[in-house]
Structure formats: C-alpha cells, structure tokens
Amino acid sequence: MRAESWTWQHPDRSSPAVEDLSLDIRPGERVLITGASGSGKSTLLHGLAGVLPAEGASISGRLLIDGAEPSQRRGRAGLMQQDPEAAVVLSRVGDDVAFAPENLAVPRKEIPDRVREALQAVGLERLPLEHPTAQLSGGQKQRLALTGILAMRPGLLLLDEPTANLDPDGALQVRDAVLSAAEATGATLLVVEHRTHRWAAAMDRIVRLDAGQSGSWAGHDSSGQYSADENSPGQHSPDHFLAALPDWSPPSPAGETLLRAEELAVHRHPPTTTWRSHQPPAPVLSRVSLSVRGGEAVAVTGPNGVGKSTLLLTLAGLIPRHGGRLDPDPETMTPRELIGHSGVVFQEPEHQFLRATVAEELDHRQDLLERLRLSHVAQANPFTLSGGEKRRLSVGTALASGAQILLLDEPTTGQDAAAFADLVTLLRDHLDTGGAVIAVTHDQDLLTALQARRLEVTSCSPTASSQEQPSAEAPETASSPELPGFGAVRSTSWLGRRGPLGKLIALVLITLALVASIDLVSAAVVVMGCFALLPLAGIRPLALMRRIWPFAVGALLAVWGTAIAGEESGRVLVDFGFTTVSTGSVMLGLALGLRGFAMVLPSVIILSTTDPTDLADSLAQQLKLPARFVLGALAAMRLMGMLAQQWTTLGHARRARGLGKGRGFGSRLASTLSQIFGLLVQAIRTATRLAVTMESRGFDGGPRSWARPAQFTAADLLVVLGGAALAAAATAAAMAAGTWSLVW
C-alpha cells in the first residue's frame, strides 16, 4: 500500500480530512493508526477500501494498493466500519458471514468451514447460524462485522476501532482473532484504535495522523518499546487516560435520591402479544433494583448482549417496563418534564441529532463547544462529523438540556486522551452540582475517573446487583419490528419449511384463477381455503386478521365505491339523486372487494412463511435472475427492517429531547412530519453505509458462489399441487354456480 501526497477533502468542509499524506506499508506489515478524533483515520481506511465518494470531493495525489487504484482492487481489502449496524448485510448470522466468501466465488464446500472458523475466532460460536442479526446487541454486531471480514481472508485488513463497543474479555478475544488471521494468511493489517495498549506490542509500527496533516510513524526498538510521544493526541498506554486528570472526589455526603428502581423487568419491546405469539416477550432482565442520589455515578457493566442498553432506555422512561417500579416514573412525564429529569445519550449518536448545525444542537453554548473541542465544526452538519466528534456532541446535547440525571450509552467510545479528559471533567462538574450519571460502559478508566458504583449485569434473568459477579454472555433476545411480508425468523411450520419456488408457483396459479373472473364464488372459495390451511402455516386466524386489516378495510372501500359509482342494474336499493345503489352494483362491489382481498390473503400467508434469504437463493439459482439484483433487493429488505427500528428509536430520541407530540392535531402532524424527515435522512445515510459494506466485501456483478443450494423437493411439489387444486376448486365452484365470467 502506498500514499503519494494524498489529499481528500469532504465537499461540505473547508479543510481536508487528510492532507498531503505520504506513506509506504509493506506486504504483511502490521500497522497501528492513531491520532486525535477527527484527524482523518477513518477517511484513510475508506480510501484504501476504494469506497470514498468521488463526487464533489477534492482529491489530489495518489493512493495505491498493489500498484493500482483501490477501486480496482475491491475484494482485496476487507473494511470494518465504525458503525456495526451498517456492517451487517443479511438477516441471519450464518448468511451474513457467508456473504463475502460467496461474492469472491469461494467453492461451496469450503464456505461452511470458513463461517465456523470465523465465528469461533471472535467468540460467536454459541450463536446458531439461523440466529437473526436484528436480535444482536451493538457489541455482538461489531463482532459479526469482523467475522464477515475474516471469512473473506483478504490480503489487506482495514479495521476501524474493532474493539470500541466490546467488553474487556471480548476485546482481547477479537484482538487475538485479528492477529491470528493476519499471521495465518500473511495479510497486511491496518488498525485504527485509540486504546493502543491492547495492540502496540504486536504491531510493527505506529502511524500517527495529526489534524489531517502528513502521517508520522514510530517504530519500536529491540525491547518492544515505542519511541512515539505517549502524550501525543490519540496515543494510549494503559494508565495514560487517568494520568492526565486532576485529583477529584465526588460530593460527600451524596444528595437526595433522584431515581429509585425496584424489581424492574425490561425488554426492548412492549409487554404485548405479537401476530405470531400468544405470549408477550419474556423480559431480558428482571428483578433489577437501583437507587441513585445526587452527586453519584453508576456504571452499568457486563458482557455484550445481556440487555444493558435496554435497561438504560427503560430507566429513561423511553421503553415501557415489563414490571417493577420507578420513582419518579418518567413514563408519566410529558416531554418537557422529561427533559429536565433525564438527558439521554443513545448507543448510536446520530439518532438524537435534530438540528442543522453543531452549534444549534448545543443551543449555541460557546462553553460547551470549546470544552468538547467542537468549535472548529460549529457550523458543520452534525452528520458529517467523525465518529468521536459525534459522540462528544451527543453528550453535549444531554448536558445542554440541564437534566438532573445523565443516562449515557458508551459515552467515551472513539475518544482520544484529550477528549476523554474533557468529557470526564464535564461529567465531574455535573456531579459537583448535584446531578447524577448512569452510564453503560466497558471503559474501566471512566469508572475510575468518576469513582462510579458498579451495577454488574451478567445474565438475562438473575437479579442485577451492585456487586461484581462472574460474566456469562447471553444474547439479548429482543425481536425486531417485522415487515408486512417477511419475518427475520424462519418459520418452523410445515409451510415454512417448504421451498420458495413451490410456494411462488402455487401463488401464481391461485392468482391467475382470481384474475380470470370477477365473481363472489371463486373469491370466497380461495378465502375459505386459505383460512383452512392456516394451521399448516402456523398462523392464528385472529393474529392474521390483525396483520391484514388494512387490506380488509381497502376491500370494504372497494365495495362501497363500486356500489355507489357502478352502473345501475337490477332493482334500485337507494336513490341519492346524483347516483343510485342497485342490486347489480352492490354485487359487483362485493365481487371486486372480495376478489382483491382473496388475492392479498394467500400472498401474505406465503410471504409470512418464506425466508427472504431462501427466496433470494431460489430466484438466483433456480429462476436465474441476476445475483446483483436479487442480493441488492435482499439488502434493501433488511434496510426496511432497520428503518422500522430507527423509526421507534427516533421517536424515543425526540421524546428525550423534549420534542414529543403535542395534544393538538397541528402539533402532532408537525411532529410526525419532522420525524419522517429524520427517518429519510437516516435511510439515506444507512443505505450509503450498507452499500459501502457490500462493496468492501466484494459485491459486484462478477461470478459468485452460493453457500446453500436451492432445491425442489417432493414436498414442494405437494405445495404446487395444493395451489393448483385450490385454483381449480375456485374456478369449478364459480362455473357450477353460474357466476364465472372470463374478464379477458
């Protein structure tokens, strides 16, 4: 890899992200890239992966991989981005890991071994290959993102803060997995990391980027000690963060109790039944008790995936609790009352940005701009900041609200030593004034700096306590919002186990029978047949109706519209003067409405029992549709599921920022439109990042392999015959009743 006076400037910025960088990295070399937050580290990795946008950007110099432009070497480099959510492409763990080897046309028989080895390397071997990726925590998604890259076995590993959201044991395991993979394959390794003490001893050299200027590097001597200045921005030793902080003690005695939780039971989603399940979701944490007083800091710690973030949002009153008490109860507060009670920092900072500039997000608080080191980007759009800058801004928005309690999710992620010190000083000031801090964190330095009381969460069901307990990782089983057609979890019903091709053929046959004639009898036969077959699909009738009620309403509207607007025939039932309702128009309306409903019903049943990835495999392998189109559509479907989650999160963020819906219609409409605009922004940004992930994993129009063969079995033939039988029965019944009439 070589950089020759390379400069890259974002179109919305006045100064380059990386300026005049010259650097040579030899094949197989291990390089640690450090530097202050916002110094261009992520930009360099994206440039090497060939995924930086060229439109509107100012670029000079050259960046080369194996003597060619990075865009010509896609698949050669594996990029792990900062955002773990956008680094997951497909809806199931095994499919997501296999995505990159498939794109690289790895032989089918080799892919399962690559998937298993990669999952074991990062500590996710306990997860079933069928496990939905939407049910993973942020830290687990970060491990999964790395797993997909390791399965590629690329020649160049580009990792952007790969251990930022991981618990200490997980961080060490991921580091060892990366180093082992680089050793086994001879890959060149570039790691961006602020916590350099985890990596330094195993790296060949450190490259430091300072404020977009030329990179400088420091090698190590025979004793393994680095000659780089440890006090430089971005450089870390195990005790470096704390050494720069002045002595401090929390207020004593502590103030009044600001929040008391008793026997809390929490889950990401409300305690209600779903369309598939008779029972509400089981709490991921239960019997959690906690009391927080003014001047106190509490650190919620524990392995990835046990429900720490869910607990934090429940304490903030943004997620309904499944049991227990909160005093005061934030769920009963109005948005304006809530903003004075608690300020929230979400795991993904972008979700809480509501203003056009950084200065507006901080209410033009010059003191916060300076103390958070954001003065130079005061007029920038918050979404264009670096990862570390976004994190500091999110903490700043919580501080600017003046809330008594700060509830922070990983507040120090992506921070260099100087930025860490600034954040700690601000949080100490908040404690000194009688406020409280509750932080979900894996950062032991933050616990020490705030002298925080530890709330160790170690499993999905036992009581969380303030005492340290042995850790036992368990995935948080929070289900995600599902799309109207597809679910993230593969159906285990008889129909769910059948192949997509057979179900699609059956659906086409039924639809053709309905399209051929507009009559009540054939439509009624199809509707009754579908409801009779619901046990084979594992769907309860009432649950199905709750899911398709909009289509039922549409059918009724079609009946009414046709009845009053259709041609008069037969006996006149009602005469409105300007129009009439006759027996003929009513019968035509009933036929059209029931026909439309009958077309929708089997489609919903088929799609509800069809796994999206299985469908994509079938379309590409059996129907020979272009793989690029099929997989792009599959990724878009996952994006839709992500947007459903983000809609809920944006609602939480708006409430946390005091912008909940008012009582009047106009206020509610304005709030909804504003949230829709926020979702549109998130959709564009998430889609862009997802496209970057797919490109960096070798996704293009070239030949590829498939980890799972799409097969057509005897049971699939039964599905086709069943569809044909239902279509024939509907047509025969209509003909026997004399209502069948060919519409062509």
Label each PLM-derived region with a short phrase:
Residues 149-150, 398-399:
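ABC ATPase C-loop
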Residues 34-36, 301-303:
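The feature captures the beta-strand-to-loop junction immediately N-terminal to the Walker
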Residues 475-522, 526-535, 645-744:
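Transmembrane alpha-helix interface motif
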Residues 157-161, 406-410:
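Catalytic Walker B motif of ABC-type/P-loop ATPase nucleotide-binding domains
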Residues 146-147, 395:
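Hydrophobic anchor residue at the start of the ABC signature
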